[in-house]
UniProtKB/Swiss-Prot annotation:
Signal peptide: none
Recorded family membership: Belongs to the pyridoxamine 5'-phosphate oxidase family.
Gene Ontology BP annotations: pyridoxine biosynthetic process
EC nos: 1.4.3.5
Ligand binding (substrate): R13, R14, E15, Y16, K71, Y128, R132, S136, R196, L197, H198
Annotated catalysed reactions: pyridoxamine 5'-phosphate + O2 + H2O = pyridoxal 5'-phosphate + H2O2 + NH4(+); pyridoxine 5'-phosphate + O2 = pyridoxal 5'-phosphate + H2O2
Protein name: Pyridoxine/pyridoxamine 5'-phosphate oxidase
Phylogenetic classification of the source organism: Bacteria, Pseudomonadati, Pseudomonadota, Gammaproteobacteria, Enterobacterales
Organism per entry: Yersinia enterocolitica serotype O:8 / biotype 1B (strain NCTC 13174 / 8081)
Length: 217
């Protein structure tokens, strides 16, 4: 470990000066504000603006997190894809509750979605899978996600084997690969503010409308 006299994480701090978030800035529907912020993150050329931290819980109440890419969103929910044998997919099969966090650090912003998941239909999954680059399709066949392997070479050898196998024609959709739709009922927007007086607003679904409240930082 580094000597604390040389490096102390408590000394790492900065002021948040990119502006605030006011009630007048909000939209009636949280997805409209999310889309605005996402487009601004893309315009600012943030790396991986669609990257989100996906949190799930196992049967013992132990939370797990990982970064996953958002692939679609609309009023029905937010969509991502994964190996159905993965840890997150197995946990969601037991407990569909989920949290998504978009960490747009360079804009001093974050957005948190809370909700439950539902599996996508085979037709929806096939439509997206068919749009992926061929090497990515083959990669989906290679990895038994979250399983233990002896070395990276195991994956690379399997990839080359399958690349040869699928050299001609289309790569079929693996039966163990699918997607989830997050049906959200709570969305929180956070904007960094001066003197640690950050702006937070939470949307909570109320039948066909959204209740909006400001939260203390």
């Amino acid at each position: 470990m580094t000597d604390n006299n040389e490096f102390d994480v408590a000394d790492l701090r900065r002021e948040y000066i990119r502006g605030g978030l006011r009630r007048s800035d909000l939209t009636e529907n949280p997805l409209e504000l999310f889309e605005r912020w996402l487009k601004q993150a893309c315009d600012a050329r943030l790396p991986d603006p669609t990257a989100m931290c996906v949190a799930t819980v196992d049967a013992n109440g132990q939370p797990y997190q990982r970064i996953v890419l958002l692939k679609h969103y609309d009023d029905q929910g937010l969509v991502f894809y994964t190996n159905l044998g993965s840890r997150k997919a197995q946990q969601l099969a037991q407990n569909p509750h989920i949290s998504l966090l978009f960490p747009w650090h360079m804009l001093d912003r974050q957005v948190i979605f809370l909700g439950t998941t539902e599996r996508l239909s085979t037709l929806e999954v096939l439509k997206y899978f068919s749009s992926r680059p061929k090497d990515s399709q083959i990669g989906a066949w290679v990895s038994q996600q979250s399983s233990r392997i002896s070395a990276r070479g195991v994956l690379e050898s399997k990839f080359l084997e399958l690349k040869q196998k699928f050299q001609q024609g289309e790569v079929p959709l693996p039966s163990f690969w699918g997607g989830f739709r997050v049906k959200f009922d709570s969305v929180e927007f956070w904007q960094g503010g001066e003197h640690r007086l950050h702006d937070r607003f939470i949307y909570q679904r109320n039948a066909d409308t959204w209740k909006i409240d400001r939260l203390a930082p």
